[in-house]
């Protein structure tokens, strides 16, 4: 079956966002990444920066895993999750597209027309890339990578009860440090 929807989960600095944009451009479809954050912000009334950051934090922060009782009601993060879930489902119904991050692989797991991709790379490739592409100036880009990936993994586990980056959750996993950004895009396009 033809894959109308492509979801790209990625390690920070692996080039997943760039790969998603290339795939969408080559397939003539839309890529939802920053656009998805803008849509979530517009519909929720929250600031874009808050929405962006909320996608990497579990509700309640560090102690959330110890205190999962929601007797005080849903958190802002929970409300954003529900809205994000609905918007991603609507986008997938509306048109062929590439969706980067935001647990889209989980949200669309029941769709047979969805190709789920995970992009990763070794620490050196990613550290070099965030310094070169994003101008990262921290003393230890490796520490930043570990922190971002840890947050993404915790968010993913919290809302999906699945392990982020586990190959069993995706149709294909690509090492952008070995294969290269452009070739990763071509591989995905060939599978769509």
What are these regions (language model features)?
Residues 2-11, 95:
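Pre-Walker A (Motif I) flank of P-loop NTPase domains
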Residues 8-24:
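Glycine-rich phosphate-binding P-loop
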Residues 30-42:
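Short beta-strand-centered segment that lines the nucleotide-binding/catalytic pocket of NTP-utilizing
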Residues 41-96:
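ATP-dependent small-molecule kinase phosphotransfer cores
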Residues 59-66, 78, 137-181:
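Small-molecule kinase domains that catalyze NTP-dependent phosphoryl transfer to phosphate-bearing small molecules
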Residues 91, 104-110:
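RNA pseudouridine synthases
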Residues 110-133, 138-148:
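Conserved phosphate-donor/acceptor-positioning beta-strand/loop module used by diverse small-molecule
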């Amino acid at each position: 079956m033809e894959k109308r929807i492509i979801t790209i989960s990625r390690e920070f600095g692996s080039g997943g966002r760039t790969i998603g944009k290339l795939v969408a451009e080559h397939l003539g479809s839309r890529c939802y990444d920053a656009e998805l954050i803008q849509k979530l912000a517009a519909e929720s009334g929250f600031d874009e920066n808050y929405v962006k950051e909320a996608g990497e934090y579990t509700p309640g922060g560090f102690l959330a895993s110890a205190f999962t009782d929601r007797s005080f009601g849903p958190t802002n993060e929970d409300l954003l999750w529900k809205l994000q879930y609905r918007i991603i489902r609507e986008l997938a119904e509306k048109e062929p597209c590439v969706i980067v991050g935001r647990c889209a692989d989980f949200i669309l797991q029941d769709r047979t027309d969805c190709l789920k991709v995970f992009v990763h790379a070794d620490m050196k490739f990613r550290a070099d890339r965030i310094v070169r592409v994003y101008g990262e100036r921290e003393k230890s880009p490796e520490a930043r990578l570990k922190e971002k990936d840890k947050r993404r993994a915790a968010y993913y586990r919290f809302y999906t009860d699945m392990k982020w980056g586990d190959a069993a959750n995706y149709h294909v996993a690509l090492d952008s440090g070995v294969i290269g950004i452009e070739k990763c895009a071509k591989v995905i396009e060939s599978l769509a």
